A protein has these predicted regions:
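Hydrophobic transmembrane signal anchors and adjacent membrane-proximal interface regions, especially
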Residues: 7, 20-21, 44, 89, ...
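Periplasmic/extracellular, small/polar-rich flexible segments of pilin-like filament-forming proteins
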Residues: 78-191
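Membrane-proximal N-terminal amphipathic helix
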Residues: 54-83
């Protein structure tokens, strides 16, 4: 009768059955270790890049939402007053916190009292106010680059421009030009 290769082998010493041998041979063990090592070398860089990919995706989502909100606010300004300067234009809802000042080009500039006939985006606080009004639930923002304080850092760039750096990975940013309404997303972590 033939025994299967998978069945237990029995050693005989001088005709006596002494022990049953089970397990891996040394060669099998070495092969498994080598295969696991190769998999680790190939897979490790991909798994390490997952965190960066998540940060890039977060900035892309925030940037796309911000860009859409700028476009909608501009459309509302065009419909309400022909796109010129407007003070306290109700963007959505009916609360004072949902109002924005629109500049002479018809784009969001700030949210500050008192009345201004020609509102301008001209400091980091204006950048923060535009950000906070345009998002219904905005990612946290401040003028600090401390990741424990806020997700984004607002930086004013003269004239009338903002750069929102992503604090967990500062190479990523969202750029807003209030004179043209352009929103640019820098989602290259190597830039």
């Amino acid at each position: 009768m033939l025994k299967s290769a998978r069945m237990e082998k029995q050693k005989t010493i001088m005709g006596k059955h002494t022990m049953k041998v089970k397990g891996f041979t040394l060669i099998e063990l070495v092969v498994v270790i080598v295969v696991l090592g190769i998999l680790a070398v190939v897979a490790a860089p991909r798994f390490l890049g997952v965190t960066t990919d998540a940060h890039v995706a977060s900035v892309q989502r925030s940037g796309a939402s911000f860009k859409t909100a700028i476009s909608l606010a501009h459309s509302k300004a065009m419909a309400m007053n022909g796109g010129g300067p407007a003070d306290n234009l109700q963007i959505y809802g009916d609360a004072p916190d949902d109002q924005l000042d629109i500049n002479r080009w018809g784009f969001p500039a700030q949210q500050w009292p008192p009345f201004e006939s020609d509102p301008r985006l001209d400091n980091s606080d204006d950048c923060i106010s535009v950000w906070n009004v345009l998002f219904v639930e905005p990612p946290s923002i401040s003028t600090s680059n401390d990741v424990n304080q806020s997700e984004y850092q607002a930086n004013y760039i003269n004239p009338g421009q903002c750069r929102y750096n992503y604090n967990p990975l500062p190479e990523l940013s969202i750029f807003y030009n209030s004179q043209t309404g352009d929103v640019t997303i820098d989602d290259d972590p190597d830039s």
